[in-house]
Swiss-Prot record:
This is IMP cyclohydrolase. The keyword NAD does not apply. Belongs to the archaeal IMP cyclohydrolase family. Its EC number is 3.5.4.10. It holds the Pfam family IMP_cyclohyd. Coiled coil: none annotated. It comes from the Archaea. Keywords: Hydrolase, Purine biosynthesis. Catalyzes the cyclization of 5-formylamidoimidazole-4-carboxamide ribonucleotide to IMP. It is an enzyme of class 3 (hydrolase). Signal peptide: none annotated. The gene is purO. Gene3D superfamilies: Inosine monophosphate cyclohydrolase-like. GO terms for biological process: 'de novo' IMP biosynthetic process.
Length: 201
């Protein structure tokens, strides 16, 4: 099954985590890269690809001391900015998705987002037809996802992880078609660590 890009939220051994994967038929020549300790970006291997689509390069993860934000586009930054301004996480998520709306490409691709903070996680999606944002008080060994295609309703997965790198690797290895690159954020004490995986080298 081809589901496009997707975000996940999970909890393993009392630690929250969030994951992201790029699956792509149109722009497979991309990679995930950590930018410092608080950011992961999706970048094209050929900068000329940016002329073909404005949606292929963005910060897919940003972390604050107690919050990790994971999305499939530039709304990562908008959500973080609203949280920093003092908005409740649910409101920051909903307002950013509503303001930026679905991607205006040939497929009307949804914008999706995940946020994890302390003991609570959030998923959101905005499509051409509507907006859905939900809060999940995560129990141990729980995992949920939402994707841009096919799995656009929040659904459960069976995934556990013990590090950010393992989150990224497990996102990449899920059986959905056309994996390109993946990233993860994993709660360690009072902060989040970041990991990326760009497939077999």
């Amino acid at each position: 099954m081809y589901v496009g890009r997707f975000v996940t939220i999970g909890k393993t051994n009392g630690r929250l985590w969030a994951g992201y994967r790029v699956s792509s038929r149109s722009f497979p020549n991309r990679y995930a890269v950590k930018l410092g300790d608080d950011k992961v970006a999706i970048m094209p291997k050929d900068v000329k690809d940016l002329e073909k689509s404005p949606y292929i390069s963005y910060n897919c993860i940003r972390v604050l001391p107690s919050v990790a934000v994971v999305t499939n586009g530039s709304h990562t930054d908008a959500i973080v900015e609203k949280i920093e301004m003092g908005y409740p996480i649910r409101d920051a998520l909903a307002l950013s998705l509503l303001a930026m709306d679905y991607e205006k490409d040939s497929l009307d691709t949804p914008r999706i987002a995940a946020v994890v903070s302390r003991h609570v996680a959030y998923l959101g999606i905005v499509t051409k037809d509507g907006l859905n944002v939900s809060t999940f008080p995560m129990g141990d060994n729980e995992c949920l996802m939402v994707a841009t295609y096919e799995k656009t309703m929040f659904s459960r997965l069976t995934v556990d992880a013990s590090s950010a790198e393992e989150v990224a690797r497990k996102m990449y290895d899920l059986t959905f078609e056309k994996p390109v690159c993946a990233a993860g954020a994993y709660q360690v004490d009072d902060h989040f660590e970041l990991g990326v995986y760009n497939g077999p080298q």
